[in-house]
């Protein structure tokens, strides 16, 4: 077992999958930091860099799994929704963990330009993401009440009215909602077309369909499930839901333009929540809402807030440079490229 000592109290210890699983024990942990996620990352050509425990006074305070990514051919590491904190999460401990990780990465692979990881506290070494978007606030539907009536009663007033109306309007429009996790590759391609329409409407670029298919197949039905709303047999909305223990998240979703007329997305999200609650799942994370750091999510946040009385604060992602000079140069190159594309109207 490799050990990286520190002049401070903490130390970084390399773990294998079993050791990390034992360290987490029964504590809630995001799927991206658990062992099953490794198969999905590998399917995308992103191998595991390593798993580590951060120990303070011989007690495991946090664990983290990092995967190899690249940007413009420059390698970086990403610990999605990591580290998982098992003890007190203080600014000092966060900073020491980052320091230990930077030292370890430089020792193992000097090519790595930065580490992308999550932190509660902003610091000098935590920089805004060079690419992608993060969030530090979300809405989580509490499914512990168990029944649709009890779950709905815990929602805001406009949310209670909204899901009732969505159920009724979708039903009157002849919509059906079902889990289709075991669908064929050909069947999934027709479902994927809904995401193409969503991307064109909302102005983003979706992953190729193979990425979503790989997520379903590598994670398996225990950890990745697909729910689809159809009208006259045609898919109009879908949610790809991930499950880790007793917690679930709507990882990806899509809705057709036509579905707005019969409130398809809202009807589907509500049906998924009720289905998961019946199975004993305790929460459904809608994954992302606006905050002062991420105002871009205001629109989706307005929709999601109807499902929960209050937002839930989560740790946002940050870039932690391991090669600061190269990181700065990479950032300048990206900004220049974006300016050129804007000037060319592309």
Residues covered by each model-derived region:
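N-terminal cap/recognition module
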Residues: 72-80
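A short, internal acetyl-CoA/4′-phosphopantetheine-binding micro-motif in the GNAT/acyltransferase core
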Residues: 80-91, 145-146, 253-262, 290-292
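A gly/proline- and charged-residue-enriched helix-loop-helix capping module
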Residues: 83-124
